[in-house]
Design a protein with these regions (language model features):
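Membrane-embedded alpha-helical segments in integral membrane proteins
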Residues: 26-41, 60-61, 86-87, 224-232
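Membrane-interface helix-loop-helix junctions at boundaries between adjacent transmembrane segments
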Residues: 85-152
Length: 322
């Protein structure tokens, strides 16, 4: 398969990496988070993930084969990765028929309507998530109770409702999960949102393998930390600690695995920093002042739209240029 994704200005030197190698590298990085979701959510996590991957692959095959009249490119792993990332943005008790709709939105609208891999403007998995969130808000915001032996005692008020940390904060609850529970994943949430440790392990693996660079995740996390920290200092009763924001919701999942998508993020390092700061600001504003407790998905999609503009104004000096 030919390689079409270039994420830096010319000249281009082939580094030995391929699309499929990077895609499967990201999938390996997601394994720790998947294992944690299996531990805490059991069979539901497996069903959601398998269904999401299967239908994402199926829809990509059907669209490429019968609508686009081209040879399917399933071996590159992009449809599998989209399916896993979509599943990681879903609750473990979501009905399969809703997952099918999400997979169709992710692949059909978010990816193939733009021409396929390398041409899409928005992150396909997030297109699927937001489509489901708007279409089925009740099902998308109902999480099962965590059913596993908790390493750290759960003392917060709504432990038996499966509520997420962000929804608790949005409702004004001050007794939140311990940092220990947020680190290991003993709290309500979507499959890929529950364990900070597992996600950070994935980040370290991708940095080690040079699948991604540090600019986007670090700029997002630093921006959220700074602005939520300022608000916490101003009013610690109303606004939670910045550490709570870092460890809860989809912030880590989004900043590590979603915002770093090659196709929908800027090419230059400075552009990545601007992009990451933008995501961090939008996420903070939505979390603190919006009616919906989590803003990561919306923030990434909004900044995806600005990526072409960032690329046109912020780019490194061309080789040999002045």
């Amino acid at each position: 398969m030919e390689n079409k994704l270039y994420v830096s200005p010319s000249p281009h030197i082939h580094g030995g990496d391929s699309i499929s190698k990077n895609m499967y590298g990201v999938l390996i990085a997601l394994v720790p988070a998947f294992l944690v979701s299996l531990y805490f959510f059991g069979l539901g996590a497996l069903i959601v993930t398998v269904a999401s991957v299967f239908f994402c692959v199926l829809f990509e095959y059907l669209i490429q084969k019968f609508l686009m009249k081209k040879e399917p490119t399933l071996c590159d792993g992009s449809a599998i990765l989209t399916g896993v990332l979509l599943a990681f943005n879903l609750p473990s008790n979501l009905p399969v028929w809703i997952i099918i709709i999400g997979a169709l939105a992710a692949i059909g609208i978010g990816k193939m309507s733009f021409g396929g891999l390398g041409n899409n403007i928005f992150n396909p998995a997030l297109v699927g998530r937001v489509f489901l969130l708007i279409s089925f808000p009740a099902q998308m915001t109902t999480w099962p109770v965590v059913d596993a032996l908790n390493v750290f005692p759960m003392t917060y008020t709504d432990a038996q409702t499966g509520a997420t940390v962000l929804s608790l904060m949005n409702e004004g609850v001050t007794e939140l999960p311990s940092y220990g529970n947020m680190l290991v994943g003993a709290m309500g949430g979507s499959l890929g949102e529950v364990s900070a440790v597992a996600l950070i392990l994935g980040l370290l693996f991708m940095l080690w393998k040079k699948i991604i660079t540090w600019q986007i995740p670090v700029s997002i996390l630093a921006t959220v930390f700074v602005f939520t920290g300022i608000m916490h200092l101003v009013n610690p009763v109303q606004y939670a600690s910045p550490f709570v924001h870092l460890l809860s919701g989809g912030l880590l999942l989004g900043s590590i695995f979603m915002a770093t998508d090659y196709v929908t993020s800027p090419m230059s390092k400075n552009g990545m920093l601007v992009y990451g700061v933008g995501i961090g600001i939008l996420t903070t504003v939505i979390r603190l002042f919006g009616s919906y407790p989590e803003g990561m998905s919306f923030a990434i999609l909004i900044m995806n739209a600005f990526t072409p503009l960032i690329n046109s104004y912020i780019k490194p000096k061309h080789f040999g240029g002045k």
